[in-house]
Design a protein with these regions (language model features):
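A short, acidic, amphipathic alpha-helical segment used as a generic capping/interface helix at domain edges
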Residues: 130-146, 163-164
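Short N-terminal or domain-adjacent regulatory/targeting segments
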Residues: 23-55, 68-70, 134-135
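Gly/Ser/Thr-rich loops at beta-strand to alpha-helix junctions
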Residues: 65-70, 157-163
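Peripheral docking tails and interdomain loops at the edges
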Residues: 166-192
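Redox- and metal-dependent alpha/beta enzyme cores, enriched for Fe-S-associated oxidoreductases
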Residues: 67-130, 134-137
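Acidic beta-strand-to-loop metal/phosphate-binding motif
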Residues: 147-156
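Basic- and aromatic-lined ligand-binding clefts that recognize polyanionic substrates
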Residues: 3-4, 47-79
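Single conserved hydrophobic/aromatic residue that forms the stacking wall/gate
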Residues: 1-6, 10
């Protein structure tokens, strides 16, 4: 998943990658694991053949902001239909779902519970304050994925992400990364 945004060969559309992660919320684990292994093999074949889902030079976008509830994927569709590629997303319906896995080295129940708690305390959601680490994570992710820009999205009723968008914009500006904030809702009227 993380490798989709690396290199010049775009192995999968950003929306396809997001759907794969979102399927993990609800799908049968053995079936999902098999499907992911098949997709990984397909991606490796594409890299070997030099075939990607977007041409070299395509603008690389990092998505951040409000989680995208199934099936609200219009921003990914708009970005990719406009000729960009979403190389990563920083949201709890995307990379936050599997980032910072649970340390499995605990030997006692208390150590195991502490490890689970530690993993969840590392999640940088907009509901936490101060939230400087989320700004650092977004900028670092954009740099790691060689993003050409950050698109920050907030649903109209998601006040926490709306408020935090100012801090995200400031962090992106300080890092020299182009930034765009979009306020939207679940309606399709702004989808073109």
């Amino acid at each position: 998943y993380a490798s989709r945004g690396l290199g010049d060969v775009y192995k999968r559309q950003g929306l396809d990658s997001l759907l794969t992660v979102q399927a993990a919320f609800m799908d049968d684990t053995p079936r999902l694991t098999g499907a992911i292994n098949e997709m990984a093999a397909e991606c490796e074949q594409r890299v070997e053949a030099g075939e990607g889902v977007a041409p070299k030079g395509t603008k690389r976008i990092l998505y951040t902001g409000t989680p995208m509830a199934v099936p609200n994927w219009k921003l990914f569709n708009l970005i990719e239909k406009a000729g960009g590629v979403v190389v990563g997303e920083e949201s709890c319906t995307g990379s936050r779902y599997y980032k910072d896995l649970v340390d499995e080295s605990g030997e006692t129940v208390d150590e195991m519970l502490d490890a689970i708690a530690e993993r969840y305390f590392k999640i940088n959601c907009a509901v936490f304050t101060p939230n400087n680490q989320r700004m650092k994570d977004i900028v670092q992710m954009a740099k790691d994925l060689h993003a050409d820009g950050i698109v920050d999205v907030a649903l109209q009723f998601c006040t926490l992400y709306e408020m935090e968008s100012f801090a995200v914009e400031k962090a992106a500006e300080e890092a020299g990364i182009p930034f765009m904030h979009i306020t939207t809702d679940y309606a399709g009227e702004d989808a073109g």
